[in-house]
């Protein structure tokens, strides 16, 4: 199959909205090229300068890429994408978007991003290692070997890093964990390696489900982690001690009532993928459903929330 890669330069704070737009037109996945994030990795010696190319975009901007199958619906979806972006430019005063488009074979798409993915210690103990890179573990390291394929999530994006660090703080030996929108499965694998008794990982994307399952088996946690195709929390009844969702603000807001119902009393919800200017909206939605905010975590333009479900009252 051939794919049309669409690369668009936009403001950093528009990343959340761009994900919604791409999903609405049926695009497959999103890649964010953030020069500030890449530069911070280089400065911290996570990557060598020669390993990556820093995107040439104006300050405060990022490049986002998505992929549309080249088929008989392509022109219709490109027109819908253009219409949605034009509407945002008019109503929300977004700057005009510069587009580039490139045609790719699936093999090109599946391998082009690998130059950007290097081993990285993302928490106090958790290390993410791509399967094609060597890494010598240090004492107490928990190494996740991962091949994210075409699914969302390598484990090194700030939104995922904040989730992993929160999991390090809250996972305990008897914990049942629910990972909503699992992508590559990295958060579920981290929870299992940190000692969770059971993890249920769900995603509505069949490519993500297949990739997550492969990564779970690769890391030998398939007796702990079950990967299932599911539309968010729809139809789930299994109670969890910890629910982790690294998605986007509007989806987290929609999840709040179901999350409150599925979490055990005093259960923990870790929500990430929230752009800073939507943080107050998510906090309000969660507190309205009875959550108390334990922690607010920030990393650049991104935020994460750790919240606790209310316990059972003495009368209940």
Swiss-Prot record:
Keywords: Cytoplasm, Methyltransferase, S-adenosyl-L-methionine, Transferase. Belongs to the methyltransferase superfamily. PrmA family. Its main location: cytoplasm. Disulfide bonds: none annotated. S-adenosyl-L-methionine binds at residues 160, 181, 203, 246. Its EC number is 2.1.1.-. GO terms for cellular component: cytoplasm. This is Ribosomal protein L11 methyltransferase. Pfam families: PrmA. It catalyses: L-lysyl-[protein] + 3 S-adenosyl-L-methionine = N(6),N(6),N(6)-trimethyl-L-lysyl-[protein] + 3 S-adenosyl-L-homocysteine + 3 H(+).
């Amino acid at each position: 199959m051939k794919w049309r890669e669409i690369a668009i330069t936009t403001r950093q704070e528009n990343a959340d909205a761009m994900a919604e737009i791409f999903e609405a037109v049926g695009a497959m996945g999103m890649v964010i090229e953030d020069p500030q994030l890449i530069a911070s990795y280089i400065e911290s010696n996570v990557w060598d300068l020669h390993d990556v190319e820093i995107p040439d975009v104006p300050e405060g901007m990022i490049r986002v890429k998505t992929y549309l199958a080249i088929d008989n619906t392509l022109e219709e979806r490109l027109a819908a994408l253009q219409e949605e972006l034009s509407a945002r430019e008019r109503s929300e005063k977004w700057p005009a978007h510069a587009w580039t488009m490139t045609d790719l074979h699936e093999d090109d798409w599946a391998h082009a991003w690998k130059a950007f993915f290097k081993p990285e210690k993302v928490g106090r103990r958790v290390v993410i290692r791509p399967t094609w890179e060597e890494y010598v573990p240090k004492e107490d390291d928990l190494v996740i070997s991962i091949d994210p394929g075409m699914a969302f999530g390598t484990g090194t994006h700030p939104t995922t890093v904040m989730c992993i660090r929160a999991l390090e703080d809250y996972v305990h030996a008897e914990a049942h964990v629910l990972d909503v929108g699992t992508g590559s499965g990295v958060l579920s694998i981290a929870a299992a390696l940190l000692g969770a008794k059971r993890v249920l990982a769900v995603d509505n994307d069949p490519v993500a489900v297949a990739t997550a399952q492969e990564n779970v088996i690769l890391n030998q946690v398939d007796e702990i982690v079950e990967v299932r195709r599911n539309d968010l929390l729809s139809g789930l009844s299994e109670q969890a001690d910890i629910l982790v969702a690294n998605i986007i603000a509007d989806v987290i807001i929609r999840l709040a009532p179901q999350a409150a119902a599925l979490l055990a009393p005093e259960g923990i919800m870790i929500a990430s993928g929230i752009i800073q200017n939507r943080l107050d909206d998510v906090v309000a939605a969660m507190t309205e459903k009875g959550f108390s905010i334990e922690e607010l975590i920030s990393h650049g333009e991104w935020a994460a929330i750790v919240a606790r479900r209310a316990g059972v009252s003495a009368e209940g």
